[in-house]
Amino acid sequence: MQYLDEPVLGYHSFSTTTADVLKPWIQQGDVLLIDGNLRISLAIKYLTQSTWSHAAIYVGPESGLTDEYGNPAELIEADAGKGVIAVSLNKYDGFNTRLCRPVKLTNVDRQTLMDTLIASIGRQYDIKNFIDLIRFTFPQPPVPQKWRRRMLALGSGEPTRAICSTLIAEAFEQIQYPILPTVTRENAKEIFHIRHHSLYTPRDFDISPYFEIVKPTLAKDFNYRNIEWSKHNQPTDF
């Protein structure tokens, strides 16, 4: 487990959105995707062919939660070493992130979502997945594309254990909010079938047609004509 929790050498963040920029725009129920810098992050990014290796969900300061240091915590996540915990939004300051928002949640469903997530604090991480994840931190692991999602779904399957995206998917499952359901047609109607939460990965919230991508820079009346560009004509190399 310690091996997977070590940072990858050469990781460079190109984040343009700080925690302070996110705070005025983030809402309860928003899913925060993170481009992580640990070995376990590298494994998940390979298996999902995605930038996003981790997901946390925003419960807000009104939840009254604190992190392990006693500081106010606004996010809930499943951590490989600590299980399901509450953390501060500041933890991911400087990381590449994406904000995914469920739309038109009722107040009752939003509260059910929050209650489900808060009740999950203390659950253990599904450590059995580590056996698979360790193998895929090495260069060019020989895993066919069609098997990658199934590999992430391996593990104990116990209700007391979770990984980051399955924790969140399970909570949305409780209120029947779609992420990437299977859709079939029956009698000229579209019927939605819930996919088991263990099959979800962080990138699914990004590509889901039922989550809005929120970019604070654009949300605050962005106008490209107001940008003051450098007078130098040569592009920078960073």
Q: PLM ranges: what are they?
A:
Residues 1-238:
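Cysteine-nucleophile amide-bond enzymes
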